[in-house]
């Protein structure tokens, strides 16, 4: 039964207990089902700690060698067979320590000298998040590369730009894709900033107050690739800012991926028809044989909500905790692990979609031409050529749009006679600005949609990414 009381207590901490925990206590207390993912970081941290203990003559070189060989054997076992889930041992630290004792005997107990699970798990978790950031950055770099390559192909491809999902002004597809390149650049910057902040080692902070042993925290920090040890032992074991930083950066990235996914979904719908989805990232319907559903994009959009939920989960866990370690903090890892898995998959899916989408320039151009998207160009022409205030030009242009709409024609299809009837200051030269190509080419300010500007930004991006 789940409420059956166990008579054995945990050998690692049970000396002051007269009886063991109930089965339900073992279940709620065990983190090994998820923190086994930390095994590589846990062994790396233990090796760094061990070498420091030996160098400071806190344990003998003979015991140190036994422990090191035991840790190597355990790492090989985990790599081959996975980490055993012994709930009675609670977590990855105790599972590894028990296995080490089985292999080398009592010398295993010396490894935990001058160390607590509090600083141990903080160290492991920081190392894991640091590795996760590096993996995400690699994925985001691949996505940026795909965006840049496709943007270069379509630097001059005209499409409608939208506000409120209403046709606004003509832009280029390359310009649109490069907007997402910029978003992902900020995402990478946020992850990079978080990596810099986390890169201080909590190892040696012990339970919360430091240790009376003559340890060298700078040595272990350097061995593990940290910039320095943390400066306050209490903060060291209390801190999960690095996990929250990761989740907040992941959430912002997921928002950007979701927006791109939403646009792909819209563009692939029949009323738009701007893109054709690749079979590899689409699914069909069980009842409607004609369907090609944008499921990969929809799942990226869906995953973004779950990632935001992971962030909120850890925020709620941490918001009311007193300093040092509380068992609530055992729940810090599942949301980070889940968010990382979801984000990594979303990035890979989006990269694959961008690489293989078929864009349909003819439909994009036709839609841009049909939506009065050059109305602003007419207003700008009136300001420049007729010298009238923009608000008056705006009103005149609105009248021209209304007339074209009544006639069922595009704005540039209005005759000069039609335009002069609206305002006699309009002359033949206005025709030069009313085509979508002229409109796009005129937006040549820095960062604008003119093909020359788009190509310049692509060149900058290729240099940043190290592309030839």
Swiss-Prot record:
Major subcellular site: cytoplasm
Source domain of life is: Bacteria
Top-level enzyme category: lyase
Q: What is this protein called?
A: Argininosuccinate lyase
Q: Which reaction does it catalyse?
A: 2-(N(omega)-L-arginino)succinate = fumarate + L-arginine
What are the annotated GO cellular component locations?
cytosol
Pathway, per UniProt? Answer: Amino-acid biosynthesis; L-arginine biosynthesis; L-arginine from L-ornithine and carbamoyl phosphate: step 3/3
Q: Please report the organism this UniProt entry assigns to the protein.
A: Zymomonas mobilis subsp. mobilis (strain ATCC 31821 / ZM4 / CP4)
The UniProt keyword set, sorted, is: Amino-acid biosynthesis, Arginine biosynthesis, Cytoplasm, Lyase
Tell me a GO biological process for this protein: arginine biosynthetic process via ornithine
Entries under NCBIfam families matching the protein:
argH
